[in-house]
Amino acid sequence: MGILEKIAEIEHEISRTQKNKATEYHLGLLKAKLAKYRQQLLEPTGKGGAKGEGFDVMKSGDARVAMVGFPSVGKSTLLSSMTSTHSEAAGYEFTTLTCIPGVISYNGANIQLLDLPGIIEGASQGKGRGRQVISVAKTADLILMMLDAGKSDQQKMLLERELEAVGIRLNKKPPNIYVKQKKVGGVKFTNTVPLTHCNEKLIMTVLHEYKIFNADVIFREDCTVDEFIDVIQGNRVYMTCLYVYNKVDQISIEEIDRLARMPHHVVISCEMNLNMDYLLEKMWEYLALVRVYTKKPGNAPDLGPEDGIILRGGATIEHCCHALHRSIAAQLRYAIVWGTSTKFSPQRVGLHHKLDHEDVIQIVKK
């Protein structure tokens, strides 16, 4: 029996098994086996084949955004309207056959936008170019899930299922679970919060399925057995995702209002150029980029649209130093910061001070 047949058999067994106290260990074992087989399917052991043409796109700019979606939902039209790149668009499916990059200039940042070929159902099983599309999507900082507003619920459900199957977790944080394997001593299980979704016996069942017999396991939050399996696998990618509903000019006002009120959702029309500015604002918010400015002693800071340094949200003075030159952090005596990240403006700070958007920094060397 091949891996695909084993996966299908386990999925069928899970779907027909009632969820209750008596079956939770059986279901936990099935889910662990399913995760193992999916990993084997998506990560072949051989050195096999060359990369697909157009998929080895070099990462550039300050952030990378990947558009995923079914064929003919408007990905190519969106890329062409938001960047200077032309991506072939037509009224038939599978117009885009390779990965096409474009660059969005916004708030002084260069954001790389990738138009990936349309994902079809079964991409997690290697159908079409699904595996290549998903491997590129995993390198992005933000996923734009393009959906046809007229088919939104069905497309969204299928895409989420495909991405879930390949280890991409959308708008979720990694579970606060610590697992450390050791050579001897058996399994030591500790939980710092009450567990409502699993217990020690179920955890042991999953560990034994993965041939783990000696380990320290600490649950610092109430997690499900699926989240515990994700931690053991260790190859899950946790990504922010914006659900972009295109072609809203073809649906009712009531449906547009319903979609727009849902979390992580944006409604647009590429053809009519509706709500594109709001989409850019949400992309900037979800990428969590900050722009900071530098100044020399005795001089005014350069606050022009092309000046400043783009950093990740939560970046510190140390990150800013590395962005300027790798030797500056070692030579830093202190930094003076003007902006919202300090209690006083200006204020003297050290290497580990976190910066806010549009802070002004003066570096003082030793």
UniProtKB/Swiss-Prot annotation:
InterPro entries: Beta-grasp_dom_sf, DRG, G_OBG, GTP-bd, GTP-binding_2, GTP1-OBG_CS, P-loop_NTPase, Small_GTP-bd. Keywords: GTP-binding, Nucleotide-binding. It holds the Pfam family TGS. One of its GO terms (cellular component) is cytoplasm. It comes from the Eukaryota. Residues 63-288 form the OBG-type G domain. The keyword Ribosomal protein does not apply. GO terms for molecular function: GTP binding; GTPase activity. Transmembrane segments: none annotated. The keyword Nucleotide-binding applies. One of its GO terms (biological process) is cytoplasmic translation. Belongs to the TRAFAC class OBG-HflX-like GTPase superfamily. OBG GTPase family. This is Uncharacterized GTP-binding protein C02F5.3. It comes from Caenorhabditis elegans. Residues 288-365 form the TGS domain. GTP binds at residues 69-76, 115-119, 246-249. NCBIfam families: small_GTP.
